[in-house]
Regions:
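Active-site anion-handling motifs in enzyme catalytic cores
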Residues: 1-363
């Protein structure tokens, strides 16, 4: 059976990064043994990754006594060359481009060049379900073009991102966000009304604008006697959501003190709509039958929502905060049955596309 080395070193404390890494590993493990290196990640992260019924998901560090960091790198590469490995893969999410300071630049260049030189040419390097963002002119354009060109395949999770770099890199393709591989996907979830809405936000600079828009949205749902919960899925969002709660308290809003953990993701099936500026709050909401609506700023962390949603959904399900209208959200809510039916179809297309592409890449 094929063997994949998988470096699961990603953002810590973000359930979104955990879930897309988990779903990707499980999908890869349908076609190969996946040896996962979780070194440096929190214990709960490793626990989720290795809590699986698939015997093809294996703990690389436990089996080989090595991890892909520091002085161990050459030892790991030797194991991959001599141990029958065919693929070198890493977690999905944003790919950090090469940039200053010099020390960081040199280390990243070496980190990319060493496996490219040392690994057997038969070992392919994949990075699937990611975003690219680097300058299109000057020194860093050329060096990042070289850097990302070392991969055999880079799968970009939005068609906008693909269009931007299509003429720059010849190793890129489109692949949907790994959240579409959510394992508890069920058409029945798209046919139930709950008369409940969820809000969830990360910190924003346009705070006063956001508050004004949320007050208008809450006023509409209060008039309709629709219950609204304020929730958070990333620990660092808690304090910001508490601040929102203080300023929106008179709007009949309920704050959920407990963070939505990986084991709690099906809580989203209790909502008709999820309004957020967190991509994986929105996508997991969509996978559980809720209408995802992105209320976003122009920050690059939030702009990816516009890019992904434009690639996925046949109706516009996001707006920039300054241009947002409660009337648009009201229309989506009033037409929720037909909107959710269309979302289900869109999700099926993305899910199937993702599964077929991964199967093709590893077969």
């Amino acid at each position: 059976m094929m063997k994949i080395f998988y470096s699961a070193y990603t953002c810590q404390g973000n359930i979104g990064d955990l879930l897309i890494t988990k779903y990707q590993i499980e999908e890869y493990a349908k076609y190969a043994e996946v040896f996962v290196d979780c070194h440096g990640m929190p214990q709960y992260f490793s626990k989720v990754i290795f809590d699986t019924n698939n015997p093809n998901v294996k703990d690389f560090e436990k089996i080989y006594g090595l991890y892909y960091r520091g002085k161990n790198i050459f030892k790991v590469l030797r194991v991959l060359n001599n141990g029958g490995f065919g693929f070198f893969c890493s977690s999905p999410g944003p790919r950090v481009p090469l940039n200053l300071p010099v020390r960081s630049l040199v280390l990243k260049m070496l980190g990319a060049l060493i496996p490219y030189v040392v690994l057997n040419k038969r070992i392919k390097r994949y990075s699937l379900g990611v975003d690219l963002q680097f300058e299109r002119t000057g020194f860093f354009y050329w060096i990042n073009r070289w850097y990302f060109g070392l991969f055999d395949i880079i799968g970009l999770r939005s068609k906008e991102n693909l269009s931007t770099y299509r003429g720059v890199l010849n190793n890129i393709c489109y692949i949907p966000d790994m959240a579409f591989l959510f394992p508890y996907f069920d058409e029945k979830k798209y046919r139930c009304n709950h008369d409940k809405i969820a809000l969830s936000f990360r910190n924003v600079t346009e705070y006063n604008v956001l508050i004004d828009k949320l007050k208008n949205i809450l006023r509409y749902f209060n008039d309709k006697e629709i219950h609204v919960d304020l929730i958070y899925q990333v620990e660092e969002d808690k304090s910001f959501c508490e601040r929102l709660m203080c300023d929106l308290a008179e709007n009949n809003l309920s704050f959920k003190e407990k963070m939505v953990a990986y084991s709690d993701l099906e809580v989203y099936e209790n909502y008709d709509m999820v309004i957020s500026n967190r991509l994986h709050v929105l996508l997991i909401g969509a996978m559980n039958g809720a209408i995802p609506y992105g209320l976003i700023s122009h920050d690059k962390k939030e702009k990816k929502i516009a890019d992904v949603f434009s690639s996925v959904f046949s109706c516009k399900l996001f707006s920039y905060v300054e241009n947002s209208s409660s009337a648009v959200i009201a229309t989506l809510f009033c037409e929720r049955d037909s909107v959710r039916s269309q979302i289900y179809k869109n999700v099926c297309v993305q899910r199937n596309y993702c599964e077929r592409l991964i199967e093709r890449l590893f077969n």
